[in-house]
Amino acid sequence: MKKLFLLSISAIVTISALAQNPDEALRTAWFTQQGTARVMAIGGVMGSLGGDISANHINPAGIGLYKNKEFVLSPGFLFNNNKFNYRGTDSTAKNNGFGYGTSGFVIAGTNKGESKWTSSAFAVSVNQIANYNNRVQFRGFNNYSSFTEQYLEELTRDRADTNAALSNYIFGSSLAFRTFLVDTLAAPNGSVIGYQSLVPISTGTYQIYDARTSGGYHEIALGFAGNMADRLYVGGSFTIPIVKYNRELYYSEKDATTNPANEFSFFEYRETFTSNAIGIGAKLGAIYKPAEYIRLGFAFHTPQFMAYVDKIRSSIIANTENYAGLRKATSDELNSGNPGERKYNVTTPWRMIASASYVFRETKDIRRQRAFISADIEYVNYRAARFQATGDNVNNSTLRDYYSNLNSTVKDIYKGNINVKLGGELKFKTFMVRAGGAYYGSPYADAAIKASRTVLSGGLGYRNRGMFIDLTYSHVMNKDAVFAYRLADKANTFANQTGSAGTVMVTLGFKL
């Protein structure tokens, strides 16, 4: 059935396979707190406790509690078990892989003389903030929309003629046009008046989405903190975020009817996508002890300013039966065998942390502390993420308008929200028992998208003769939404994701 889909000019959509998707804003913003095994065992709490190298990435004032040198290494292993429901059809996907928590070293010492600053500490550490090793796979029957409609929107919005449709969108629309998955729509006099999709949406298709991702969001932190009379601790860290993200995507739509003459059998879209970034940022914080057993903390994380380079290769195979038969087109054929590349900048959301801890039998000698309970409240302004053109493209009016619209979309579909973390520890001479939990609220403004992350964790620790080892298991229960594609002319359909992710973390440390 031939039909022209019109695009609202004011709408923002994924304009090509190389364009940024608003979902990418969450990749470096919505994550559960990672750290050493000790920190993960207590739910990621480290806003006011200090004395752990993970503080360099949460509240750098916490490294001011160090009085000695320390070296820490934290290897880990992750388990992912995802469940999806897409338009009434359930599916599952599993993926496991290695990861790591906060690792590095701290150099600390007391200050001699009459200085008000009792001691100071310097730390260099690396932390895997997010692990991207995952698999997202779902399927279902859809008689509401099609992946191909994003190509119609793109060609219609740009008022593309047939020459442009053949060559200007080499990672998406041009592939669909060359395989006759999308074709021209002609008036009775033969003139081209638009474009049509050969996918019979009204009778429906069986859709499959299968994405395998790998990589991680890493952060190097160089921190310094000072200790004033064992009452006030202030610190800051200079951060270098590094992103390595890889995705292998397979997507298909298959005719749900048995009609061999409706000019559509199936199509398959394949994509290889990589995204690498490096940036700078800062974290500032303070911890105050109004009494020996109480610690209050506050930290502010500036936005991370990151420079991205994305690369992509894609292909489409389509069978339109007696319309054009079986056809294939690849981006390599249209781009001299090279991947597509785009450079741009991203500013991540800022965040604030307020924290309080109660330490039982608090003394200046941390070896004599017997227990603690601590809580963090974190606010993240997810809608503050921003995309920008870079280099020679800064003055490109088309890209400038595109990023302006994309940023408006980010502001519309996301919101700020609060994350709550709670944890505690009991110490029995050289052995410790720990437990914690956390709740991460939804970043989506649309209440219909049910998204959250709940963390339950526990662990054991051993400390003796300048050596310590910690073992933790952290269990994350996820709720999220996954969009196979986004459209501008109708409500988007998505898969509801539930499931769990488990992490086993071991931290080995030495007091030097």
Region roles according to the model:
Residues 20-34, 108-512:
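Outer-membrane beta-barrel porins/channels
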Residues 1-25, 512:
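Bacterial Sec-dependent N-terminal signal peptides
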Residues 12-13, 69, 431:
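Alpha-helical transmembrane segments and their juxtamembrane interfaces
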Residues 9, 66, 244-246:
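Active-site-proximal flexible loops/turns
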Residues 45-46, 52-53, 278:
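Short hydrophobic/aromatic segments of transmembrane alpha-helices and their interfaces
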Residues 37, 49-58, 64-143, 215-218:
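Outer-membrane beta-barrel translocator/receptor signature
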Residues 30-48:
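N-terminal targeting signals for Sec/Tat export/insertion, comprising classic cleavable signal peptides
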